[in-house]
Amino acid sequence: MLPLPSEQRWQLPAPVQINPELRGSGLCDPLLAVLQRRGYSDGAAIEALLNPAPAPDPRRHFPDLGKAVQRLRQACKQGERLAICGDYDADGMTSTALLVGVLRHLGAQPQAEIPSRLDDGYGLNSGMVERLADDGIRLLVTVDNGVAAREALLRAHELEMDVVVTDHHTLPEELPPLLALLHPACTPDHSPYRGLAGVGLAYVLAMALARNCRSEQGLAMARDLFCIGTIADMAPLQGVNRRWLIDGLPALKRSGLAGLQALQQVAGLDDAPVDAGAVGFQIAPRINAVGRLGDPQLVVDLLTTANDDEALELARQCEQLNRQRRDLCDAIEAEARALVEADGEQRCPFLLLAQSHWHHGVIGIVAARLVDAFGLPVALLASEGDGRLRASVRAPKGFAVDAALQACSDLLERHGGHPAAGGFTVRAEQITALHERLNERADTWLKQQGGLRLVEPEALVQLHELTPQFWQQLQQLEPFGSGHPAPLFWSSRCRISQQRLLRGGHLQLTLRQGDAAMRAIAWRWGSEENLPPEVDVAFQLRLNRWNGTEQLQLELAALRASSGDGLLLERCNRHYWVSRDGDTLVIRNAAGEELRGQPDRTGVCTLSSDHPSGTHPYVQALLQDAAMAMGLAA
């Protein structure tokens, strides 16, 4: 949901002089401005982004990789039974399926072991270890978990089991004895492997093993699973992640995995490309829905079967669970919104809401929706029984969830997370004290923000510039995701010629700017309030496919009333009135003195008349700031 104009604080980027060296990339000025502001300051940096270096030999980056490969090769040669112990999210399930598929191809007998989100909780546990040992399993490989399972690892050591841990979660200070550990933190500083998720580590292990066995036929399908899991887990799209995604995403459409073909079919992707967006918004949710509501073994079976009919039946089960997940999310969101809105103007700065019947598997999704709706940190709690509640926490940019939970650790039984999201378990009698402490922290943060949500566009683009050629150049910067988001553009003085509230509370606009017109969509707007006739919009550019047609449209992140006749600009504690006369910039100071200039795309102004201070650095910087604020510079 977009923040209302009254709830926003726009922070426009500083004007930038495009480095002439960057123009050799063939990209247009708005995209070059985005890249230069992100730190890509020369041609070599942009080339490294567009065409990353091949992955270096992983054996030089993971100290224990050789030991892990040697033990797994022995298992493959002997047809040994072993367990792949995964996690119930998309990263963990794709990691499990990846290793199961490769190890079967190489002669081992792997079995998937993934705990239930509802019955078992996260990760490897002692009961699982003992059950596997009783069943004759002597080799365990964890994927996307393991480093936090101290008791389980100690029990495996006592039972003389060989354990290979592959995990990307925070390493504890000390680990029990292991055969091998593959973890990004074990790689050298600045290693391109540092950003790997669980599925990336599984892929590294699978590649090294297959090459050691001189049998690489199954690696193409392993790469497909790497792409799905990496995007689903929102791993940073840097280093080898970016290199392998650039190589692998174009092949997903024709994947040899029957399960992936079936998922494309049930997701309605038959005639659409399978890019990072399709993975993140169409395929990954159908996989994650199983981990949230069902048995993760369903996904492992789907992604390892070679039977097309079986794959389609399993994919349909994923689709059914995904629909159930959507219905649950909508119902819980409606209840949560009602609770928040019942407080009216007395709304707490930290939204902590609890209902015993809410489903643990989906409250994190709903918490994220509420963050978008209200711009506040949110914790949703559901009952675990025995007087305990388990929570999912989400927060806006700038509010550190992990630090907030650590500050409340004395009130919590368990907690964990990172700056944007986390979770905790708390006893019911501690909730009031917990909420008070979280409110204090959120109130301090809100005051620092001025109570407004920050909107930070990266480059100015006029509507007439949003052509198919612009879209093609934007696609050269893909894939987008964590660490490399799709650019947030802005455009000024757009006239709203049509406004329609769609089913689901989405707002559709037709925007006009001169002779150019574009359709825009604001997801989950949820309001029929009248908008200003002329607006500035912050947006990401999307390609909308519908009924066999393709059309560029703006996906709105924010809008505000255009400055109209002008705006007040502050610089160095001095105030100036800034306005436009066509494409001419007009600046007046408190004494009524006036500057007029014609800014170029970067904000550099040619003054309309000779002015004694026209070349002074302060005046030039003032002109650039004013040109940016009025939408005359990128």
PLM-predicted stretches and their roles:
Residues 138, 179, 536:
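Conserved acidic residues
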Residues 2-5, 13-138, 211-431, 450, ...:
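Hydrophobic helix-and-loop "lid/oligomerization" segment in the mid-to-C-terminal part
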Residues 98, 176-215, 219-231:
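Short alpha-helices
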Residues 37, 242-337, 372, 393-415, ...:
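Acidic, two-metal ion nucleic-acid-processing modules in DNA metabolism proteins
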Residues 168-169, 359, 418, 506:
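Histidine-centered active-site/metal-ligand motif
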Residues 1-12, 157-174, 249, 253:
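An acidic intrinsically disordered interaction segment
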Residues 143-197:
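Histidine/acidic-residue-rich, glycine-tolerant segments that coordinate divalent metal ions
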Residues 151-155, 366, 469:
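A short acidic, amphipathic alpha-helical/loop segment
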